[in-house]
Amino acid sequence: GCWVTADRSHVDQAVRRKLFARALKQEVTVPADLGEMVDRLLSRSALGALGLARKAGQVALGAAKAEAAVRSGKALAVLHAHEGAADGVRKITQARRATVHAGGPDIPAHKLFSEAELGLALGGTNVIHAALLAGEAGKAALKRVAALDRYRGIAPDADEVAAARTTENAAEDTE
């Protein structure tokens, strides 16, 4: 057997450099789009798990409900659609920071899916913001979402970084 680090850049590099054949010491045929195939499968798995979490009542849909779940400490993670406005992301990010400041958990945020993908998986329309809630289905969905995030190697969202800086600067100004 052979191992490849589970991120897109390493898989693509292994395909390009024919490292599977070298590691297995024999000629192997690897699809040129293996990295994309793995991404699609991880994405499908994550979206399916999100749908199951919703059916189990462990997803809060909408900015207001997601923010309330974060502030109450019930949220395991926050999901933002790619189309999410900076203002909505900022408000939920502030709620996440306030929760941490109050001694609550550090709630991760993920921006991996489009509005259409989230809407289809979660059974809603115009799903821009959602929160995964505590429970077995929520934990399982978070595990799959986090695996996709790691595979894609996505850096923190630029809107979130900017919102964090604005919040930190405002806090420094009031001191």
Predicted segments with their positions:
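Short active-site oxyanion
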Residues: 1, 56-57, 75-77, 103-108, ...
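Short beta-strand-alpha-helix junction that forms the catalytic/metal-binding core
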Residues: 1-7
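Extended interfacial segments that mediate partner engagement and assembly in macromolecular machines
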Residues: 8-88
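Short, glycine/charged-enriched secondary-structure capping and boundary segments
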Residues: 19, 92-95, 124-125
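Arginine/glycine-rich "motif VI" loop of SF2 helicases in the C-terminal RecA-like domain
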Residues: 71, 96-105, 123
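Short, solvent-exposed amphipathic alpha-helical segments in soluble enzyme
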Residues: 93-98, 146-148
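Helix-rich interaction surfaces within compact, conserved domain-sized segments
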Residues: 109-163
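Charge-patterned, long linear interaction tracts outside catalytic cores
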Residues: 159-175
